[in-house]
A protein has these predicted regions:
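Active-site micro-motifs of SAM-dependent methyltransferase domains
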Residues: 38, 376, 398
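Post-Walker A helix-loop "phosphate-sensing" segment adjacent to the P-loop in P-loop NTPases
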Residues: 377-383
Length: 565
């Protein structure tokens, strides 16, 4: 199929309204296979306005007939139409276009081009920026890199030798036959062979058998993730699965115990058993205790996101109405529960010296939310720029979060939600809360989090394409597209992404989850409705102050790194 077949009208005269306190742009509007472009006239600024069509979440079109638009160019003020584009990055754009027929044709073209489902026809497969080479920055291989890090840490560990060399890198999933959503290599107990892994995979939903997510060197404990066991109504058991979790405790240290953090409610887990799922039986997994910490996912979380954006987009509501709607959408409640569950897992490892297994049902959503946040709390390396990028690769991209499904639509789509859910956005919001409470402990700033949000929904890079590593291999994403990290790590981008106040903090950071401690992330949810200039000026001032301090040889210190009551 040629893109030209979907373009009914290629260009028209138009005016673009972008938001408050932003001047309108007037010129020639052009539709291409992947972009919407507005080329200003010769008397205007030479800047070219560009919108990736994949960024369009919903489109509303109105034929105006003889409507007198609020335009200063007479060529558009008569027979005209209006297109309102609501974008996945939460922008709302209005295009006033000359000619009703041209308006409707352009709207239909945008609808068709923005909803193409084929991965290999998406823009990342055509994007060839200057200064970047294909294959560059696709060198992140978290299982291999992380295994080497564990080896270094265990060799220097004061724990007994037999208990610290207890993990191995398994390539049993080399052809993705064990688990299509896992990477080719995973870290598992050395005492468990690949045959046992295969049997355990058949006992777990989607083949997601327990694998190591994080090794906490100071206490010699581990964080694992998996999917639910397929016990079913008959309460089935799997000797290999039991052996795997028994080996985890045996190889941690003598007398070690474990906690299974189930991100479903006890009632939901019980209902799952009726459809073939279930939980680990106490008798079958001695030494492991199950804790239920329900986290919303799927449609309830998507509806919460939609309600929040509806409230943020209403400029005429009263203070009481705003506070009521903010409370009613329950978004900050989801943030609180996610951080609380991550703190529970981190406390179990740090304070109790316990091993932690996290799973829900599929193990690809709230499970990854908890394991990644727990690592940020405990691991200083995850709070560096490079470490955070590796965390995203390890715990989200290669761990099988289905970005293509979850980020198919944002908050404005008119279609009934199917697989969409802002799980990754919830993670980014939680990280923003950590950065706000510990302003010196993260090497990356809000700009990095905003960039990750934008690129997860629509990007010229291939990093967030597809739903699993298997799909990315089939589509040759790593050889035919550019990595997002290659773009973000360019020197000219780093000033916008880094935290100028960062000071390495070797301690765990324990966030407060009290209601008064959590804030609405205005930099994301209100960034297109509030003028950006004040925050941009403040950011540049912070950079200037931090640079002056470093020049004078003084550095700030972060005093908020101890657990809060």
């Amino acid at each position: 199929m040629e893109f030209s077949e979907l373009i009914r009208t290629g260009q028209a005269q138009a005016e673009l309204l972008r938001g408050p306190e932003m001047p309108p742009l007037r010129g020639t509007l052009c539709v291409t296979g992947h972009h919407l472009l507005l080329s200003p006239g010769p008397q205007a600024t030479p800047d070219l306005w560009l919108l990736l069509l994949r960024n369009v979440d919903s489109i509303e079109k109105r034929g105006q007939g003889t409507l007198s638009l609020s335009l200063s160019i007479p060529s558009v003020a008569g027979d005209a139409g209006t297109i309102t584009l609501r974008c996945k990055d939460l922008r709302v754009l209005q295009l006033d276009i000359e000619g009703v027929e041209a308006t409707l044709d352009i709207a239909r073209s945008i609808e068709a081009l923005s909803s193409l489902e084929s991965v290999i026809t998406s823009f990342p497969f055509f994007y060839r920026p200057k200064g970047l080479r294909l294959g560059e920055a696709w060198h992140f291989h978290p299982p291999e890199r992380y295994y080497k890090r564990i080896a270094r840490e265990t060799w220097s560990s004061p724990l007994p030798v037999p208990q610290t060399r207890a993990w191995r890198l398994s390539e049993a999933n080399e052809d993705f036959s064990l688990c299509p959503s896992y990477p080719r290599a995973v870290i598992v107990p050395r005492a468990v062979d690949d045959d046992a892994l295969a049997r355990s995979a058949r006992f777990r939903q989607g083949g997601r058998f327990p694998v190591l997510s994080y090794y906490h060197a100071p206490r010699g404990t581990v964080l694992l993730r998996s999917s639910q066991p397929l016990t079913g109504p008959q309460k089935l058991r799997c000797a290999a699965d039991e052996e795997l979790l028994r080996a985890v405790l045996a190889e941690a240290r003598p007398g070690a115990r474990g906690f299974i953090v189930d991100t479903r409610s006890a009632q939901a887990a019980k209902q799952a058993r009726m459809t073939g799922g279930g939980t680990e039986a106490k008798a079958a997994y001695p030494g492991w205790k199950r804790l239920h910490r329900p986290l919303e996912r799927g449609r309830p979380l998507q509806e919460s996101f939609v309600c929040l954006m509806e409230a943020c987009g209403d400029p005429e509501q009263s203070m009481d109405r705003w506070l009521s709607r903010l409370d009613g959408c329950r978004w900050l409640s989801h943030v609180k529960e996610a951080l609380s569950t991550a703190c529970l897992a981190a406390q179990g490892m740090e304070w109790e010296g316990a091993c932690i297994l996290v799973h829900g049902a599929e193990g690809t959503d709230s499970t990854l939310l908890v394991t990644s946040l727990a690592q940020l709390i405990l691991d200083p390396l995850s709070r560096t720029m490079a470490g955070f990028q590796e965390l995203i690769e390890q715990e989200w991209i290669q761990a099988g979060h289905p970005f293509q499904l979850r980020c198919a639509h944002s908050a404005f789509s008119h279609t009934h939600p199917k697989h969409e859910a802002p799980i990754f956005l919830l993670f980014l919001d939680c990280v923003w809360q950590l950065g706000r409470q510990f302003p010196l402990s993260l090497e990356f700033g809000e700009g990095m989090l905003l960039a990750l949000f934008d690129h997860s929904y629509a990007s010229p890079f291939g990093t967030f394409l597809c739903n699993s590593e298997k799909e990315r291999c089939l589509c040759e994403v790593r050889t035919r597209t550019h990595s997002l990290w290659s773009g973000l790590n360019q020197p000219k981008e780093q000033r916008k992404l880094r935290n100028p106040l960062y000071v390495p903090n070797p301690l765990a950071i324990w966030p407060s989850v009290e209601p008064q401690s959590l804030r609405l992330w205005q930099g994301l949810f209100l960034r297109w409705t509030h003028p950006p200039e004040p925050s941009e000026v403040a950011w540049e001032k912070v950079w200037q102050i931090a640079t002056d301090q470093k020049t004078e040889g003084s550095q700030p210190t972060d005093s908020a790194s101890e657990p809060q009551p």
